[in-house]
């Protein structure tokens, strides 16, 4: 009995121990301890690859398309051009990042680079075998080669990779110079000229992935074989399955993926390994996706179908087609799922039912119907839309295109799809564009200005009157200390230049020019930025800063240095004293300055103001600004003559003075005296001007022309009409200071950036946030910016860190006193009118933006068909687009080479106080002109501006009933005056 009890006790104890041990082994406590130990082991064993984050960022920033053409007569010219362009682009990115290209399967053109040449196809036998060593200085470059190499082993080397590859977004279709189909998950690619290849496609459609590599080296492979033979590998596999950790394991490399679109179905892929670990330390499949081949095939008992889902700008699209067939169909994924659901619920299904449900032609519907009959599960791989470069253009023609093989450097990027189906364009950086810049912005305008110039003795006297009126007391000005100038120049590059040149006083006056990176509504001559030596700029700035503070800020027509709210009040004050407002537009303003304007007006003002102690130095600095030797970034020498050097300290103030003088001179030529003409100058900001309508269009344009300028009257707006100043549209400045950013100009470029340094997502947030400060209530602009921010990750940005954002948010004073806005429904009419759509169409699209929730790539776009005619002949979007002829006049009467876009069609005028429609008296009336009108009476803004603005004074003439009533009498008085010989 005792023995039985003892045995029972032993069995019970053993059972208790087993149960306790089982509970302990399966407890969360032990699992947490094992997981913590595993995490510590991972932290000890993982290796971070040096500079991976920096390399990825540099590749993103430096990815600028370089186009390389091939000889005419090539059997597949377009495909070869794209391939060569991709190779040159990748090589350029590597070298700009400071690394060396390592080219796998190089062509004869890349023979000078390190690389590897093995035999994958018959064409490879043209070259010899080679295999250079890969070092830390290399970035691997491949062009149409990744299909044939072991990407797991290659990525496992830990070296960044750039590759140009085929990434189809449909299961069959046309490609440049050929077509492709897919069978057994292999692409069959046929190109004109006889190229016929089959290969698998790697799936790069994840932003972060991993690969497992085999052991490298003789001893590592020998040890692996011994572990396999002795069963150690099997035991390790069991422990790994149960515990998630085990001894030994294969190398695992984690890497990031970025894709950049080169063409239809063609991408440049950037692969940057950033960490390594061992497969035995972590359940790697739970962490992310392993790099694998694409799987297109959908197996079933009837017929094998191929399917692939592509995330486009307008949402996911699914492509379907029978294996090996060229015919395929692509439709929205949501539509296909709805059609399939209806098919499954219906008792009888005919082809006609699928045609009706899909809304597709019979031929396409037949493919959908066949797929539904096959009852495919349709588990398709997802292909993501790659990042795009913005649209760039390059000048063509015998005068500019001196090197037919030259392909410009692209720089602008898109952080979202364009709000409109039409988008702005950017000039690429190239020699041909530099030649076009010199011709279209400097040499050409200078020649035309000289042919127009006609300076009379009276004009010289009026110029002296203007100088004396602006500077009534001579010799009082002194420059600010250079330390003050340095304090104002807070940008990093400015500070670096100040530090480098602080102890250098002598310099050679050489103008170094470059093409400005900016967007244009349509191809135009790129603007020229002419930089001057740092010492010249700093010394001259000490005078311009002092003159601005002591003189310019105190005159009523000078708008720089004022906040947006103050400028809006100035516009309203000008409207209050006028029954008509005139918008002016100068064409190529900087390039049309001549010696009279520079020396007898601009320089004369500064010299009259400065004290005699400083006159010699100022005279030398001003003389340096004329006819200085100049050279472009690519080494093209040119003569700027008397044109404005746009990088000079004189630019903003000098242009404002010249603009004001034209208005003043026109008033004097109309018969006004000095004080009267001064009071009717209006307001100016650089080359932007707005004045009262008491001088005729003809007199204004003729006056400007006699000085060499090319001035056009954009709009002569009566009371109650919209007016534009500084690219902002005022609905009715006679009753409200509210305005909106010019809709067309803004929406064409809102989604782009010229910033090549910052992260693209940060730029998108900063730019949309800036527009929500200045234009949150502007229809479409505000809606689009809110839709963008609603569908992406919020960020904290500092406006000072970004160059390519609106000027009016870079200053805290401007942000605190931003443009007045209102929520009037009439703004919808203004925006719709500029975009060439109806108000109903606009409101429908705004509702889509407000309701949108999804990826940024799918933001709704408004379809527009605005006439955006090129101002010069260019290569754009793979085509030659001809510019206007020399004698061509645009249909709306505006200057065909002007930088300002032509206004859109007019709205019908609303009735005035007399019951009749008010008429807008624009120059060259035409339906192409914007002619919108609003009510005369609107509530005024109750809150005053933050600081007073010098009001536009009321004319001193007591017999003037309206703006133009006294002009006839003034002209008579002027003729009766004794002529004075000047």
Swiss-Prot record:
Molecular function GO terms recorded: nucleotide binding; RNA binding; RNA-directed RNA polymerase activity
Gene Ontology terms: biological process: DNA-templated transcription; viral RNA genome replication
Region (Disordered): 879-982
Domain of life of the native organism: Viruses
Tagged with keyword Nucleotidyltransferase: yes
Keyword set, alphabetical order: Nucleotide-binding, Nucleotidyltransferase, RNA-directed RNA polymerase, Transferase, Viral RNA replication
Biased composition (Basic residues): 972-982
Compositional bias annotation for Basic and acidic residues: 913-934
Annotated catalysed reactions: RNA(n) + a ribonucleoside 5'-triphosphate = RNA(n+1) + diphosphate
This enzyme's EC code(s): 2.7.7.48
Composition-biased stretches (Pro residues): 945-954
Chain intervals with Polar residues compositional bias: 883-899
Keyword Nucleotidyltransferase among UniProt keywords: yes
Domain RdRp catalytic: 579-701
Similarity section: Belongs to the nodaviridae RNA polymerase family.
Function, in words: RNA-dependent RNA polymerase which replicates the viral genome composed of 2 RNA segments, RNA1 and RNA2.
Official protein name in the record: RNA-directed RNA polymerase
Organism lineage: Viruses, Riboviria, Orthornavirae, Kitrinoviricota, Magsaviricetes
């Amino acid at each position: 009995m005792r023995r039985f009890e003892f045995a029972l006790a032993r069995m019970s104890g053993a059972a208790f121990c087993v149960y306790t041990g089982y509970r302990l082994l399966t407890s969360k406590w032990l699992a947490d301890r094992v997981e913590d130990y595993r995490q510590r082991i991972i932290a000890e064993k993982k290796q971070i690859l040096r500079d991976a984050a920096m390399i990825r960022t540099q590749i993103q920033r430096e990815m600028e398309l370089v186009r390389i053409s091939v000889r005419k007569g090539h059997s597949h010219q377009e495909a070869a051009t794209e391939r060569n362009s991709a190779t040159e682009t990748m090589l350029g990115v590597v070298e700009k990042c400071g690394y060396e290209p390592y080219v796998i399967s190089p062509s004869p053109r890349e023979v000078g680079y390190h690389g590897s040449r093995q035999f994958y196809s018959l064409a490879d036998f043209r070259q010899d075998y080679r295999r250079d060593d890969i070092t830390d200085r290399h970035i691997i470059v491949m062009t149409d080669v990744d299909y044939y190499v072991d990407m797991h082993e290659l990525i496992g080397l830990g070296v960044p990779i750039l590759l140009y590859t085929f990434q189809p977004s449909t299961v069959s279709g046309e490609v440049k110079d050929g077509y492709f189909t897919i069978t057994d998950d292999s692409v069959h690619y046929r190109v004109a000229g006889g190229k016929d290849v089959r290969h698998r496609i790697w799936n790069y459609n994840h932003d972060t992935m991993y690969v497992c590599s085999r052991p490298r080296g003789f001893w590592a492979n020998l040890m692996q074989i011994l572990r396999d033979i002795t069963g150690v590998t099997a035991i390790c596999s069991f422990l790994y399955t149960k515990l998630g950790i085990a001894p030994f394991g294969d190398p695992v490399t984690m890497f990031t993926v970025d894709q950049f679109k080169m063409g239809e179905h063609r991408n440049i892929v950037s692969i940057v390994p950033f960490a390594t670990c061992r497969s035995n330390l972590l359940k790697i499949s739970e962490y992310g996706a392993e790099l694998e081949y694409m799987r297109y095939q959908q197996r079933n008992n009837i017929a094998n179908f191929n399917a692939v889902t592509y995330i486009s700008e307008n949402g996911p699209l699914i492509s379907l087609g029978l294996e090996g067939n060229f015919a395929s169909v692509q439709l929205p994924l949501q539509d296909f799922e709805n059609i399939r659901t209806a098919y499954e619920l219906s008792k009888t299904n005919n082809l006609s039912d699928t045609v009706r449900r899909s809304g597709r032609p019979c031929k396409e519907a037949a493919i959908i119907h066949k797929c539904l009959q096959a009852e495919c599960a349709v588990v398709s791989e997802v292909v993501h839309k790659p990042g795009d470069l913005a649209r760039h253009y390059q000048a063509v023609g015998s005068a500019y295109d001196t090197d037919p093989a030259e392909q410009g450097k692209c720089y602008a990027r898109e952080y979202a799809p364009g709000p409109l189906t039409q988008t702005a364009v950017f000039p690429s950086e190239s020699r041909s564009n530099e030649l076009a810049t010199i011709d279209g912005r400097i040499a050409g305008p200078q020649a035309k200005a000289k042919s127009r110039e006609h300076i009379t003795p009276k004009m010289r006297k009026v110029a002296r009157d203007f100088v004396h009126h602006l500077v009534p007391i001579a010799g009082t000005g002194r420059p600010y200390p250079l330390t003050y100038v340095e304090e104002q120049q807070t940008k990093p590059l400015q500070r670096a230049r100040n530090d480098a040149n602080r102890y250098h006083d002598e310099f050679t006056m050489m103008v170094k020019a470059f093409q400005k990176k900016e967007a244009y509504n349509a191809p135009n001559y790129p603007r020229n930025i002419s930089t001057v030596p740092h010492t010249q700029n700093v010394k001259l700035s000490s005078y311009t800063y002092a003159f601005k503070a002591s003189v310019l800020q105190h005159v009523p027509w000078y708008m720089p240095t004022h906040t947006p709210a103050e400028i809006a009040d100035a516009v309203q004050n000008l409207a209050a004293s006028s029954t008509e407002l005139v918008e002016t537009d100068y064409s190529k303003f900087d390039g049309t300055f001549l010696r009279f304007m520079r020396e007898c007006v601009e320089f004369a003002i500064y010299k009259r103001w400065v004290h005699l102690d400083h006159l010699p130095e100022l005279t030398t600095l001003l003389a340096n600004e004329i006819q200085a030797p100049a050279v472009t970034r690519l080494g093209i020498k040119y003569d700027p003559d008397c044109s404005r050097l746009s990088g000079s300290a004189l630019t903003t103030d000098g242009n404002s003075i010249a603009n004001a003088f034209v208005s003043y001179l026109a008033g004097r030529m109309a018969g006004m005296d000095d004080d009267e003409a001064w009071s009717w100058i209006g307001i100016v900001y650089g080359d932007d001007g707005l004045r009262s309508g008491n001088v005729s269009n003809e007199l204004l344009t003729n006056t400007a022309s006699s000085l060499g300028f090319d001035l056009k009257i954009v709009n002569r707006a009566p009371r109650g009409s919209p007016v534009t100043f500084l690219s902002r549209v005022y609905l009715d400045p006679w009753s409200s200071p509210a305005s909106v950013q010019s809709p067309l100009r803004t929406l064409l470029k809102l989604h782009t950036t010229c910033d090549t340094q910052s992260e693209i997502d940060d730029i998108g947030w900063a730019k949309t946030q800036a527009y929500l400060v200045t234009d949150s209530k502007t229809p479409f602009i505000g809606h689009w910016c809110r839709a963008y921010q609603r569908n992406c990750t919020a960020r904290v940005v500092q406006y000072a860190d970004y160059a390519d954002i609106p000027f009016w948010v870079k200053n805290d004073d401007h942000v605190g006193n931003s443009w007045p806005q209102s929520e009037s429904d009439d703004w919808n009419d203004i925006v719709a009118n500029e975009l060439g759509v109806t108000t109903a169409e606009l409101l429908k699209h705004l509702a889509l933006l407000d309701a949108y929730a999804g990826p940024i790539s799918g933001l709704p776009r408004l379809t527009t068909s605005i006439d955006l005619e090129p101002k010069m002949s260019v290569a754009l979007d793979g085509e030659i687009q001809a510019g206007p002829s020399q004698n061509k006049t645009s249909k709306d009467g505006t200057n065909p080479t002007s930088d300002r876009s032509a206004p859109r069609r007019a709205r019908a005028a609303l009735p005035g106080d007399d019951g009749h429609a008010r008429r807008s008296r624009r120059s060259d009336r035409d339906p192409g002109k914007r002619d919108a009108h609003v009510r005369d009476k609107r509530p005024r803004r109750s809150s005053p501006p933050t600081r007073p603005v010098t009001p536009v004074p009321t004319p001193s003439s007591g017999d003037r009933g309206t703006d133009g009533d006294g002009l006839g009498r003034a002209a008579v008085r002027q003729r009766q005056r004794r002529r004075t010989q000047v």
